[in-house]
From Swiss-Prot:
NCBIfam families found in the cross-reference section: kup, PRK10745.1
Organism: Salmonella gallinarum (strain 287/91 / NCTC 13346)
Main location: membrane
Keyword Acetylation: no
Reported function: Responsible for the low-affinity transport of potassium into the cell. Likely operates as a K(+):H(+) symporter.
Residue ranges of the TM segments: 12-32, 49-69, 103-123, 137-157, 165-185, 213-233, 247-267, 276-296, 337-357, 363-383, 396-416, 419-439
InterPro entries: K+_transporter (IPR003855), K_trans_C (IPR053952), K_trans_N (IPR053951), Kup (IPR023051)
Keyword Membrane set for record: yes
GO cellular component: plasma membrane
Name this protein carries in UniProt: Low affinity potassium transport system protein Kup
Topological category with respect to the lipid bilayer: Multi-pass membrane protein
Catalytic activity: K(+)(in) + H(+)(in) = K(+)(out) + H(+)(out)
Family: Belongs to the HAK/KUP transporter (TC 2.A.72) family.
Compartments in which it is found: Cell inner membrane
Length: 622
């Protein structure tokens, strides 16, 4: 849903509730339970309950309301958000060295997201299914199988798209938040003393009383704000104002009421710590609440899956991941996509995590490191944008950065304590993704530079061919060209082996702009290089899919008539060999070869009919 959509504000706000707030909205299922479960050396004590509630409330205010909704969401690229967008914006007005550092930060943040998405569906669905322990304790052995069944169904429907099912997301999540509020308010009315925890003094007293342990306990408190990056990442779908409106009118009040309601329950009944969320409900409401919780966590998982599809497409289009098959599941909404490879790889990883960790409490130990790491990087990148792009006063920006890091760094440091008990998982997955992205980008650059160095000058070659033309054959030939100033290898090899040229030769370059969309007026640029040579440059945004047939249509409007089924497409297929390098660079080269062999072929990327494609091979040493 783009920001220029003509839907009414209430409908867009409702849709935002259904998609954006799924992850953070299901955090009450497990957050307070993990805070007070006894793992930090203290149980359900009054000061501890007040301290944790105060910390949760002020984190929701400072991190979500102030940092993300007020500050970070100001940084948009044509309305789009996300960590890679922030990386792109931050690097626009900086030196080459600074830009490289910012790119690394952005890629680390994106990699952290990949590490976290494996945990989110598992912990969300398992925490909901664990309500069975309250309803029927004898069914606790079914928690893992049922969680896998629910997620299997979710991943299976991805290829069909979520357009129809997605219409139910908003009313279900709105119902979820209203139930959160009602359950919490009911408990608060019975014990209003808990509202004293709104005073930040209780958070300060918590640190003073529990000292070192209180710092480590921040690793559990951060569970209340997991999913905060989704607010920024989904900005392009719904717009800033609907997301902010949904937070302040529905989501924030519901979360606060439920957390404080759980706290009020625990003050009266400390034994409810085994599952304070479900024990808020009366006995007759447990089964309906269990079903609603399962639906809410499935929706939260769907939002994460859609997010990883979007991030992958953006990384592919920006050249950080190898091309892969991307299927559009909706003719109306460009954001609804399905990536089979990513879908089933993620499913396999989630199932392995569920089977390995067995309980959401065990998974909570793995949750948080990647989230807080991304928060630190977002603070640095967003304040860089404020200074370099918005030209804010450097001292004011420095104060903002210090304020953000004073919260982010302690949260990240506290989560490092989880490293051995599960935190290694998202970090390991993130490291793998970072290695893959940097390998593809750097080795691809090395390959293109190598081909450019050994290529022939375009202008000189065309002048030579026009002066001493080879045999011409009827028709149009399109040569896919990566570099504007160099003759494509496929053209050189065609001349070398076939010794002919077509009557019309088009050098076609498809490039990705640093923007989500490119206006149709700027889509195609045509330049006639000689009586028989044309250069066509087609520009696309990173949210768009290149389509050669569309390019031909645009060319026809500009006076260069082309017919797909009467055109031959010549492409070079590089056979790569790794040259002499240090051992670690050889390993990176081998990884690149593996990625390239499994990458989507160019004809499939650009939707070119296979029977119109001629591939000419060339060997390149990298």
């Amino acid at each position: 849903m783009s920001t220029d959509n003509k839907q009414s504000l209430p409908s867009i706000t409702l849709a935002a509730i259904g998609v954006v707030y799924g992850d953070i909205g299901t955090s009450p299922l497990y957050t307070l339970r993990e805070c007070l479960s006894g793992q930090f050396g203290f149980g359900v004590e009054r000061d501890a309950v007040f301290g944790f509630l105060s910390l949760i409330f002020w984190l929701l205010i400072f991190v979500v309301s102030i940092k993300y909704l007020t500050f970070v969401m100001r940084a948009d690229n044509a309305g789009e958000g996300g960590i890679l967008t922030l990386m792109s914006l931050a690097g626009r007005n900086t030196s080459a060295r600074t830009t490289s550092m910012l790119v690394i930060m952005g890629l680390i943040g994106g990699s952290f997201f990949y590490g976290e998405v494996v945990i989110t569906p598992a912990i969300s669905v398992m925490s909901a299914i664990e309500g069975l322990e309250i309803v029927a304790p004898q069914l606790d052995t079914w928690i893992v199988p049922l969680s896998i069944i629910v997620l299997t169904l979710l991943f299976m429907i991805q290829k069909h798209g979520t357009g129809m099912v997605g219409k139910l997301f908003a009313p279900i999540m709105l119902t979820w938040f209203l139930i959160l509020a009602v359950l919490g308010l009911r408990s608060i009315i019975a014990n209003p003393e808990v509202l004293h925890a709104l005073n930040p003094v209780w958070a300060v007293r918590f640190f003073l009383e529990y000292k070192t342990v209180s710092f480590i306990a921040l690793g559990a408190v951060v569970l209340s704000i997991t999913g905060v990056e989704a607010l920024y990442a989904d900005m392009g779908h719904f717009g800033k104002f609907p997301i902010r409106l949904a937070w302040f009118t529905v989501v924030l009040p519901s979360l606060v009421l439920n957390y404080f309601g759980q706290g009020a329950l625990l003050l009266k009944h400390p034994e409810a710590i085994k599952n304070p969320f479900f024990l808020l409900a009366p006995d007759w409401a447990l089964i309906p609440l269990l079903i609603l919780a399962a639906l809410a966590t499935v929706i939260a998982s769907q939002a994460v899956i859609s997010g990883v599809f979007s991030l992958t497409r953006q990384a592919v289009r920006l050249g950080y991941l190898s091309p892969m098959r991307i299927i559009h599941t909706s003719e109306m909404e460009s954001g609804q996509i399905y990536i089979p490879f990513v879908n089933w790889l993620l499913y396999f990883a989630v199932v392995v995590v569920i089977v390995s960790f067995e309980h959401s409490s065990n998974l909570a130990a793995a949750y948080g490191i990647a989230v807080t790491g991304t928060m630190v990087l977002t603070s640095i990148l967003s304040t860089t944008v404020a200074r370099k792009n918005w030209h804010w006063n450097k001292y004011f920006v420095a104060l903002i950065l210090i304020a953000f890091l004073c919260v982010d760094i302690p949260l990240f440091s506290a989560n490092l304590d989880k490293l051995l008990s599960g935190g290694w998982l998202p970090l390991s997955l993130g490291l793998i993704m970072f290695t893959i992205m940097t390998t593809w980008k750097s080795e691809r650059f090395r390959l293109l530079r190598r081909m450019h160095e050994h290529g022939n000058s375009l202008e000189a070659m065309i002048a030579s061919l026009e002066k001493s033309p080879p045999v011409r054959v009827p028709g149009t030939a399109v040569y896919m060209s990566r570099a504007l100033s160099v003759i494509p290898f496929a053209l050189l090899h065609n001349l070398k082996h076939n010794k002919v040229l077509h009557e019309r030769v088009i050098l076609l370059t498809l490039r990705t702009e640093d923007a989500p969309y490119v206006h149709n007026v700027r889509r195609v640029q045509i330049e006639q290089l000689s009586p028989t040579f044309w250069r066509v440059v087609a520009s696309y945004g990173w949210r768009e899919t290149p389509n050669v047939e569309e390019v031909f249509h645009r060319c026809g409007l500009e006076g260069l008539s082309c017919r797909m089924m009467e055109t031959s497409f010549f492409m070079s297929h590089e056979s790569l060999i790794v040259g002499k390098r240090p051992w670690y660079l050889r390993l990176r080269g081998k990884l690149y070869l593996l990625l390239q062999r499994n990458a989507l072929r160019a004809p499939d990327q650009f939707e070119i009919p296979p029977n119109r494609v001629i591939e000419l091979g060339t060997q390149v040493e990298i």
